[in-house]
Amino acid sequence: MTQKLHPVVLSGPSGCGKSTLIKKLTTEFPTKFGFSVSHTTRAPRPNEIDGKDYHFTTLEAINQKIEAGEFIESATFSGNKYGTSKKAVHDVLETGKICILDIDSQGVKSIKKTDLHCVLIFIKPPSLEELERRLRERGTETEEAIQKRLESAKAELDYATEAGSYHFTIVNDDLERAYKELKEIISKEISQL
């Protein structure tokens, strides 16, 4: 009898460190974890690779797949659509790895309605000021985009305070401490599955 591997969802505002934590996890444990690559209609940032960081696609193509029921969640942010296909998750699970997903709170609400039984972890920035500093430090966003991301962050933080929204919350005020906490949570959850 094979053990069902439950996906792990990291959620939180843009700039809270989700991608960095996921990269650390999949680099340290490449045979244990696989990243579910989301689709997006936004343009790639410098150093992002199609098929590795995101599947960069058109609005028409992503909408067709969503309408065909091929996605477990999707959301629109700053005029761009993002989503996770069933295939992306199942491709990782088929390798025998635990699937790691990077999904916003809209997506978390959708994924809770599926049969995936995900471990939901909220990555919280130490403060909105620090989050703004991180977003500005990227140097990839317009002022308007930064303001939209900060507005979205407030909504994400509000949702995270609702009872039952997430199983765990990690404050990412120190990357190494946050990463250690993430590994401890996943280790405990995996042993209970």
Language model: regions and residue ranges:
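ATP-dependent small-molecule kinase phosphotransfer cores
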Residues: 38-99, 106
